[in-house]
């Protein structure tokens, strides 16, 4: 044994798999690090599309998900989300929306609650008269894959309100009251096109 009481790894017989994603525990086993997020899907484009489909991202592997998205929409169009059900069809009903917006001029636009309706409407527009602005959103999605619970989303977003001509902070929650499994989602423009767009989906690692 060296004078500093250390033992080289070469002299240890550890169980498990040594890799860049594991660490050596005190009981001499290699294990995956807990916590953090795992990138599941990255979707982006720079040509006109009227909708963006992100399918087969919700599974039994994760309970919670983070979705980051940024895009521009032509025609000052609003946009909405629909879940993709386990059979591949769109969920077109039973969305309850809770909606508030903090406007740059200091006012708070309380849009209250709406629903049940056919979509989760989450964006006014991207401020198409401001060429450098994109609408950006961070979704937290809870239990979308479970067939025994309602799927819920919170939205923390920023964009532009063309009717008021001011930037806005978007604060939302959405509940789909159908108790069913969802495997993905679709973002759809009311009119016009998305271009450019970028969406990344992460699974929150179960402890």
Describe the function of each predicted region.
Residues 1-44:
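Fibrous stalk/shaft segments of extracellular and virion attachment machinery
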Residues 34-207:
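Surface-exposed molecular-recognition determinants
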